[in-house]
């Protein structure tokens, strides 16, 4: 007997706890086994399943530490947080083996270390699971000015689904299909309001409905509660690390030394950590020093960005994302000294205003970096605490453990990842929130077009903070773009109440990169793409901040096997980068270029910080630059390439293919081959035009090695 499992009334509980899935969660136990002589006071579990938050583990009678949690099917990354510290590499413990022998593998954590990987298998259940939550964008949203409705079902059990309204019924298309589920989709002209329900048939022919009671319906109120930003959907974003981009005004270079953290960090001075090499100015092509990450200054500035705007315009760039430009004590700028002041090493407020004006003239938006979780040692409130202790009005702005203390000593106060130069702010304090929101308002009114937010998952009372920040931001500038630095797949941040997008490493780095590198085949990649696009609303993926590299990863060309800093790029790796970037430009959302990737810049496998080396403007791989220009041109000319709609088609061995755009004339088919040999591919029925060659094709075609072909349906 076929048994129907309908998750309708249970959705209330699912919504409350943020659990929206197709398969029942399974119990999984994580265990840490210390060495016999190891003194362990605390162990916690952090991973992609909890936004890298902290789940304390319990000490067991046998001396091990463990925790049992419920996780939905899929693969997850994680680390054990031992005695309040991150292990850099989960694959290597003191004796040479892994920290967690139960891990099924390891993956680059983006910071030069390795995360462990676990896999949760699907619990086999009888019947069909149906899920539709009208309050979640993954099931109902407005995308490309159409109402999108989706139903998630068990895999390989449903033959047909219809959407039923008072006006009639419409057949829904099977949009996504992966190991743990399927998604049926329908888009309609944006209605004033809509009562609707789902009716369908299993592969055995049994009818089902959702809601199960025919007298009940779901309801859409006709209001777009989470507007899509079209300028993002149709755009191309370029990330700039200002200190290493271009030196447009050498006169301000020396100012970097005067504001450096060196002047505030007593702990470093006491331990003589600056004895051999302190903060320094370097020529634009000087060798990388041991202080390259943070205190080797090359002179990049706002004037340099202004000077290169026409170059960026020529690449098809429509928005800039700038790493922190406010007063700070480092080259990277994530140790803010004054949120209301442009760093003197980059220029003045007048320089920033000129940059905004010149960018806007060219049709470019400018997104700034915001760091509300922690400050630098030179931040005025922290300096007041250093001097006055509990008598300081800013004592409760931080989490101070003892006083007096030496600035830079992480045992004296809470700091980001235990880094003493980054004391953690108490964003649960109303005064702190009011100050930070004042910063948000000021720079939006100054002309900024959005915020990328650093480590949002680490803030105290994060959800409260970002819900309020969103309200303030959208009130000041409704089309401002809000991006969260979340590395994993996590829809909870993009439900319309906090952010517009995550930094989508989960798409570009975890899925596309591994296909381009050849680490996963087309079938596995298609499965991962389905899981990704099923998790998010189409309005969200249309606003995706889609990147494959950044200031926090290795250089993408090096990671693809292109060689190390100073080498000539390996030609095969260049072709892999072209394949990877083409996929990035054809999927929903805005492709993001990290400065210099379009020029073929290499980094170092062994020295992580070299990926931030200054762009050498006299050298470039011209074929890559031409490639990126062509991709931007295609996105501007072919509407389907910037559509929010994706449908999977075929994936196996070295082949990956998917559709973009609504079904019918004008939709495009993207076909990629990550292998070393030419492969045969059967086009779907009809006439297809190659968007690069112009020829009209039918039937069997051949896709060369490491190539992507794009076809438009006629």
Where are the predicted features?
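Carbohydrate-binding surface patches
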Residues: 648-684
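Conserved, mostly hydrophobic/aromatic
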Residues: 151, 240, 312, 322, ...
